């Protein structure tokens, strides 16, 4: 079992149940999935960019990403319907907790000029989104073998009903929020 999953079950869930005054353990907010998305607008002219992004995300997550395609043509962005424009991967269960553990303990401390995560990046329903400017903060990526620095979006989907519940959950996981 993943380390964070065990910590959640034994320490975080009982503490949150008391803190949020919930009647049942199943009401306690939990992280259901983590979605990593890499938007690649520059991939329009070059297939190699998509292949490299897929390889990077696969190294980071240990799971094969899905290529996303444009749903409709937009002349302003010079894209046509059906062209590949990004890659995404959804992590659940043990892989999700292992990724979250690596993100909090290894990757975020490696971010340059890191002052904490924005505590206002909740969507109103307890889900949290954050952006990473460079994929090299992950130790799985070899700096010498990358072709370009690419950012990615990380979304944590939770069962929390409000932002305050979601914030309490992530604080219990020791997320480094800015004050």
From Swiss-Prot:
Keywords: Ribonucleoprotein, Ribosomal protein, RNA-binding, rRNA-binding, tRNA-binding. One of its GO terms (biological process) is translation. Disulfide bonds: none annotated. One of its GO terms (cellular component) is cytosolic large ribosomal subunit. InterPro entries: Ribosomal_uL5 (IPR002132), Ribosomal_uL5_bac-type (IPR020930), Ribosomal_uL5_C (IPR031309), Ribosomal_uL5_CS (IPR020929), Ribosomal_uL5_dom_sf (IPR022803), Ribosomal_uL5_N (IPR031310). GO terms for molecular function: RNA binding; rRNA binding; structural constituent of ribosome; tRNA binding. The keyword Oxidoreductase does not apply. Part of the 50S ribosomal subunit; part of the 5S rRNA/L5/L18/L25 subcomplex. Contacts the 5S rRNA and the P site tRNA. Forms a bridge to the 30S subunit in the 70S ribosome. Belongs to the universal ribosomal protein uL5 family. PANTHER family: 60S RIBOSOMAL PROTEIN L11-RELATED. HAMAP family: Ribosomal_uL5_B. This is one of the proteins that bind and probably mediate the attachment of the 5S RNA into the large ribosomal subunit, where it forms part of the central protuberance. In the 70S ribosome it contacts protein S13 of the 30S subunit (bridge B1b), connecting the 2 subunits; this bridge is implicated in subunit movement. Contacts the P site tRNA; the 5S rRNA and some of its associated proteins might help stabilize positioning of ribosome-bound tRNAs. This is Large ribosomal subunit protein uL5. The gene is rplE.
């Amino acid at each position: 079992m993943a380390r964070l999953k065990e910590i959640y079950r034994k320490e975080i869930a009982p503490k949150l149940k008391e803190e949020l005054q919930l009647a049942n353990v199943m009401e306690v907010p939990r992280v259901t999935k983590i979605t990593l998305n890499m938007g690649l607008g520059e991939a329009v002219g070059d297939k190699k960019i998509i292949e490299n992004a897929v390889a990077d995300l696969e190294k980071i997550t240990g799971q094969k990403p899905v290529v996303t395609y444009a749903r409709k043509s937009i002349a302003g962005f010079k894209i046509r319907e059906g062209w590949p424009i990004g890659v995404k991967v959804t992590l659940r269960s043990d892989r999700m907790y292992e990724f979250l553990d690596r993100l909090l303990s290894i990757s975020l401390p490696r971010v340059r000029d890191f002052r904490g995560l924005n505590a206002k990046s909740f969507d109103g329903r307890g889900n949290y989104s954050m952006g990473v400017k460079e994929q090299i903060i992950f130790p799985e990526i070899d700096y010498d073998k990358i072709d370009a620095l690419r950012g990615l979006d990380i979304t944590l989907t939770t069962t929390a009903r409000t932002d305050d519940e979601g914030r309490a959950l992530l604080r219990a996981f020791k997320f480094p929020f800015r004050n």
